[in-house]
Amino acid sequence: MEVNILAFIATALFISIPTAFLLIPYVQTATQSN
């Protein structure tokens, strides 16, 4: 089964970008609480 590199990149961006938007405020609040 051949892996389409563009589809892999699109999927990685589609997963990582919303995760970053959720993770960045969480890390900021976690660091400020200490």
Curated annotation (Swiss-Prot):
Swiss-Prot/TrEMBL keywords: Chloroplast, Membrane, Photosynthesis, Photosystem II, Plastid, Reaction center, Thylakoid, Transmembrane, Transmembrane helix
Lipid bilayer topology: Single-pass membrane protein
SUPFAM superfamilies: Photosystem II reaction center protein M, PsbM
Record flagged with keyword Transmembrane helix: yes
Localization of this protein: Plastid, Chloroplast thylakoid membrane
InterPro entries per the UniProt record, alphabetical: PSII_PsbM, PSII_PsbM_sf
Domain of life of the source: Eukaryota
GO biological process, one term: photosynthesis, light reaction
GO CC annotations, alphabetized: chloroplast thylakoid membrane; photosystem II
Record-annotated disulphide pairs: none
Chain segments annotated as transmembrane: 5-25
KW Transmembrane (keyword) present: yes
Family: Belongs to the PsbM family.
Entry-linked NCBIfam families: PS_II_psbM
Quaternary structure annotation from Swiss-Prot or TrEMBL: PSII is composed of 1 copy each of membrane proteins PsbA, PsbB, PsbC, PsbD, PsbE, PsbF, PsbH, PsbI, PsbJ, PsbK, PsbL, PsbM, PsbT, PsbX, PsbY, PsbZ, Psb30/Ycf12, at least 3 peripheral proteins of the oxygen-evolving complex and a large number of cofactors. It forms dimeric complexes.
Function as written in the Swiss-Prot or TrEMBL entry: One of the components of the core complex of photosystem II (PSII). PSII is a light-driven water:plastoquinone oxidoreductase that uses light energy to abstract electrons from H(2)O, generating O(2) and a proton gradient subsequently used for ATP formation. It consists of a core antenna complex that captures photons, and an electron transfer chain that converts photonic excitation into a charge separation. This subunit is found at the monomer-monomer interface.
Protein name: Photosystem II reaction center protein M
Taxonomic classification: Eukaryota, Viridiplantae, Streptophyta, Embryophyta, Tracheophyta
Gene: psbM
